Amino acid sequence: MKKKGRWIPVIGCLMLVLFLAGCGKTIDIQSTAEQEIPSQNQIVVGVSQLGSESMWRTANSASIQQALCKENGYFLLFNNARQKQENQIKAIRSYISQRVDYIVFSPIVEDGWETVLQEAKEADIPVIVMDRNVSCDPSLYTAWVGSDFTEEGRNAARWLEEDLKGKKFDQKETVHIVVLRGTSNASATLGRTKGFAEIAKTHPNWEILDSDDADFTTAKGREVMEKYLQKYKDIDVVVSPVSYTHLRAHETRRHL
């Protein structure tokens, strides 16, 4: 299956996938069957998606399947890891044993990938990390295609700055903030939390009452928000990494 020197088109497809994910269909993405046999001229790509925890992730998975399709010259092996790192590692090892041309994965957490990525490197299979990032030797993967999560956190704080100014909020009055984080130790969670905190600390009147993991899911986001509303009487701002979770958090507030 090995086809050298063709990783740039794959990265280009993945960049388009991330750009279009927000516009994708919200369908349930399952792991693809491995019964078909690829033709000699197809590029075989094994993808390990971390799960389907949000509308964005589901759209992202749909975009991957649309971009890496047979009509575009690809043979796609797709695995939904269902929020478990061990499932991702198992899928990657399966792709290595099948001698795919490329491995693409969106890591659920940053750490714990060194061994399996070393195995892929020794098998001479290029690995492309998508969306979230990994914390390991960069030589173990070919490229990372994703966003600057720290800057996303800063942008959220900057938006809050402008919103408070527009509402003529008294700069001496305390702004009570609660944070619904994503998955613990995920690069998206770490980066956005860091970026928001950088700007928040320049505002002495911004008080972060609490911050807890909501796993990028509606159910967990609602659970954490219910806890906040029972614990704190005065909440001015909810910071959430996923707009859908944020909307459900407001729904919870109406119910209490």
PLM feature spans:
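Periplasmic-binding protein-like
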Residues: 47, 100-107, 126-130, 179, ...
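C-terminal motif of bacterial Sec signal peptides marking the signal peptidase cleavage site
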Residues: 21-22
